């Protein structure tokens, strides 16, 4: 069965992008993002690479960050908002809460439309991350894009975290970036970020590892143990071997429809 795109999905994505003060590409397209993982049995994901629907936006959030004087606003840049298909879900628990040594694959949500919003790295406080996350959920709820029930997976957050460490001799080091996948509660977002701050500092002091090509990792959040756990090494974008999706035509929007 070939993939199809419905107009309603594009409408909701563009509506969200405009609410985030994004520019909207008049012509957009889809691409195949190729990688191997248990939740993606076909070996590629339909996504958008170089021509996302929406790009270059910003959201102002209230912030008590002392670096901006406290009690002001902080601008969070939006790099892009693009459509892609959702993947499956890997589980490691049995009904009733028992643990399972392997992985249970749930493909019920695979192929459903997903809007991914990517921010600039404008956060340096976990408090601002939480304010932004709640603001984003409020915007999407108001627009009717989602019910925003976190426990049902309506919204998931995937923070990318690393530290900038200044040493006493005046040098600056940046730890490798870690992406925490599929956080479905604000408590999990806060817990994962705070844990990673401590873990990455400890790792740097032990190993001296710093940011570099191919050093990015993907970790998950264990809600029971309150720790992050390694899931896989994260490939760089060029390793995904993006190429235009042959089974979906480009998306062209005229000005009247957009307005």
Q: Locations of the language-model features?
A:
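Basic, nucleic-acid-interacting segments
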Residues: 1-259
